A protein has these predicted regions:
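Ser/Thr/Pro/Gly-rich low-complexity linker/stalk segments immediately outside membranes or between
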Residues: 25-47
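Acidic Gly/Asp/Thr-rich repetitive segments characteristic of extracellular carbohydrate-active
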Residues: 53-84, 89
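Hydrophobic alpha-helical membrane-insertion segments, chiefly the h-region
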Residues: 13-24
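All-beta strand scaffolds that present successive hydrophobic residues in beta-strands
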Residues: 85, 102-105, 132-135, 154-158, ...
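N-terminal Sec-pathway targeting helices
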Residues: 1-11
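Right-handed parallel beta-helix/beta-spiral solenoid domain characteristic of secreted/periplasmic
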Residues: 65-66, 87, 100-143
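Short glycine/acidic-rich loop motifs that flank beta-strands on beta-rich extracellular proteins
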Residues: 90-96, 114, 119-124, 143-149, ...
Length: 222
């Protein structure tokens, strides 16, 4: 093999290896939690991340910034509206008693919208409306429950991180047709996820640990 041929072959091999190595290091951008991203084992965040789900938005989009009230945005919202909560800390309890409300935390550079109960507030998010979506929040230091449903149907609770919070991390009850997926729940005094007196609730791909109980489903049918 002559010297010129050896040099050309070495360049080709090096270029091929560089391209393959570059492809392996490209981190996908999270545009939605629909693809199965989880807090630990899912996609890597990059500098241009937007975790607003890719779903058809029928109504208006209301943006909540740090210093604003999430509850006030819920009160302003009409059925079909999406409330986007920007990264920052919010210390309040949010009640959703309307149908078709999407409450979505925006993830930017790995930072989430964080609801902090400061060890004083009872519950973080309570909903009784139908077709409610809650996703992408970090919830901590509430005395009662992280996300609790009371008779809301067709709900989705996904891609939330709930740590060191009260009695139950995620607690839908008296509901029908719900989805609880890709949440990370830990440090809960009772069950990380508790499904009570509900029908057709799909619980999948959640990470639960360091709680008294993991996933508890009682008096429910699938």
């Amino acid at each position: 093999m002559n010297t010129k041929f050896k040099v050309v072959l070495a360049i080709v091999i090096f270029a091929g290896g560089w391209i393959m190595g570059s492809n392996n290091n490209v981190a996908p951008v999270i545009t939605s939690s629909m693809g199965g991203a989880s807090y630990n084992g899912g996609f890597k965040a990059d500098n241009s991340i937007s975790a607003v789900p890719q779903r058809n938005v029928e109504g208006s989009v209301i943006v909540v910034n740090p210093g604003d009230s999430i509850q006030e945005a819920v009160e302003m919202a009409q059925p079909g509206d999406t409330i986007q909560v920007m990264p920052g800390t919010y210390s309040e309890t949010v009640y959703i008693d309307k149908d078709d409300i999407h409450l979505v935390g925006v993830i930017r550079e790995g930072e989430r919208a964080t609801m902090d109960g400061l060890g004083k507030l009872n519950d973080a998010i309570l909903y009784s409306g139908n077709n409610v979506v809650v996703e992408n929040f970090r919830i901590t230091q509430y005395k009662g429950n992280g996300i609790m449903g009371q008779a809301g149907n067709n709900f989705e609770i996904r891609n939330n991180v709930i740590v060191d919070t009260g009695i139950y991390g995620i607690f839908p009850q008296l509901g029908t047709n719900g989805l609880v997926e890709h949440n990370v729940v830990s440090g809960i005094e009772d069950a990380a996820i508790y499904i009570g007196m509900s029908d057709n609730i799909h619980v999948a791909h959640n990470e639960v640990f360091d709680s008294v109980a993991g996933i508890e489903i009682e008096n429910s049918r699938h």
